[in-house]
Regions:
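Short, flexible, mixed-charge glycine/proline-rich loop motifs
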Residues: 1-3, 29-30, 267, 350-356
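Iron-sulfur cluster-binding cysteine motifs and their immediate structural context
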Residues: 2-26, 31, 35-51, 284-289, ...
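Iron-sulfur-associated redox domains of electron-transfer enzymes in respiratory
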Residues: 48-349, 355, 368-379
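Sterile Alpha Motif
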Residues: 378, 388-393, 397
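Sensory modules in modular signal-transduction proteins
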Residues: 395-426
Length: 426
């Protein structure tokens, strides 16, 4: 960490504190969007890996089943899930399925809720970072959040119903899934695509060498929800959109925050909301940044897979699982306090801001406005002195005092040898 404050500036909920010149994540405020791990110039923030724990599970002889996020297609440059499934079998997994089958049940639940007309507005609950954002920072919008499990949890419940004794591991590009899995109690671990790449390399598994191998009688079935990881993907999972709502996709932290701030002014709007710009294909642990074309190419690959899938494969037949997908999303207190006006003025005065004209709102400290900075100081998230104009003014003032009180004659010249300053001794 080199005092650049880029992570503070970029964090949508200001869940980062700066103490002793080090930026640290405030766990209770973090929504686990993972954005700070991507934009840190020094790579000072890393994602905790569960790889060693999963290795122990795989080596224990337990029946381990993987639930694989459909964005694997773009991250690993594949066009067939069977290739990934074979690779997982080589690692010791008993079986693997696409999380999209759980997403299909989620879409069905959304359809039922939309047709009931009980929601003024409707926000999808597939993204755990969005759910956390609403729970902790926009609790008034909880009335619009779909009371439905995420696709990962829905699929885990399906697998648990079929294999009660199995260990279930989710594989995907999302950091927020780690907390969601831990809180659910039905998922035994989460591996990111970064973890999988490391594991494949460690075991000398080359996906390109598996491409031409097929699993006899093991072809996957078509599923509209395989488009979930891209922007507008949830909308594509509906065979027909229920009438009565305007449907739109909102992705990226800034657009999500903007939508939530204004949602009370909307009516009959369905919001497919993802914290990651362009959807899960651009998740913090996706590998799309390593491919030419980035998230746009990744979106194209998933779309191609989705279209080919529904065109060539038999529709997936869902048996009656008897699974309850209802989910309550309670409000979460984030423990920050709004400072009284007198405290704001007192904090600003300490750094030479005595009037509104002194509040430059330059954003160098990581906060959009000087008053936002005062809020952070009041809550103990940063130091008041971390203010570029204040530090510059103080440094210039100190330099002036040193020059004027030096026992030596001092003359300051610019690069063209014009005199800029001279003390009394000079």
């Amino acid at each position: 960490c080199k005092d650049c404050y880029k992570c503070v500036r970029e964090c949508p909920v200001k869940a980062i504190e700066v103490k002793d010149h080090q930026a640290r994540i405030i766990e209770s405020r973090c929504i686990l969007c993972g954005h700070c791990t991507l934009i840190c110039p020094q790579n000072a923030k890393i994602v905790h890996s569960s790889l060693e724990d999963i290795k122990q599970i795989l080596n224990s002889g337990a029946k381990v089943i993987a639930s694989v996020a459909p964005s694997f297609i773009s991250s690993f440059g594949l066009s067939d899930f069977n290739v990934f499934k074979i690779a997982l079998a080589k690692l010791g997994f008993f079986d693997a399925e696409e999380t999209a089958y759980g997403a299909e049940l989620v879409t069905q639940q959304y359809k039922t809720l939309l047709e009931s007309k009980q929601f003024k507005n409707f926000i999808t609950s597939a993204c755990p970072a969005v759910c956390r954002l609403i729970q902790a920072y926009y609790p008034k919008a909880l009335q619009y959040l779909a009371p439905v499990d995420s696709p990962m949890i829905a699929h885990a419940k399906m697998l648990r119903k079929q294999h009660p004794d199995a260990k279930i591991v989710f594989i995907g590009p999302c950091i927020a899934k780690k907390r969601e899995a831990m809180e659910s109690g039905i998922i035994d671990g989460v591996l990111t695509f970064d973890d999988m790449q490391e594991l494949f390399h460690e075991r000398n598994i080359v996906l390109d060498e598996i491409i031409n191998i097929s699993l006899e009688n093991k072809r996957t079935t078509a599923c509209l929800s395989k488009a979930y990881p891209i922007s507008h993907g949830i909308l594509k999972s509906f065979p027909e959109l229920p009438k009565g709502y305007d449907y739109m996709a909102v992705d990226g932290p800034d657009r999500c925050v903007d939508a939530l701030q204004n949602i009370d002014n909307l009516e009959n709007v369905f919001l497919e909301m993802n914290i990651c710009k362009d959807g899960c294909v651009n998740g913090p642990c996706s590998l799309s940044v390593n491919i030419k074309g980035g998230s746009i190419k990744a979106t194209s690959e998933v779309l191609k897979y989705y279209k080919n899938d529904i065109r060539t494969l038999a529709p997936h037949q869902y048996e009656e699982y008897g699974i309850d997908l209802n989910k309550l999303y309670p409000r979460i207190r984030n423990n920050s306090m709004p400072p009284p006006e007198r405290e704001i003025k007192s904090i600003l005065a300490k750094i030479g801001k005595h009037s509104e004209a002194d509040e430059l709102n330059c954003g160098a400290c990581g906060y959009a406005t000087c008053r936002d900075k005062a809020w952070a100081v009041y809550n103990g998230y940063t130091d008041a002195e971390i203010c570029l104009p204040y530090m510059r003014e103080r440094a210039e003032s100190l330099s002036y005092e040193i020059i004027q009180h030096s026992p030596n004659g001092i003359i300051l010249l610019d690069s063209d040898f014009y005199i800029q300053d001279i003390n009394n001794k000079g």
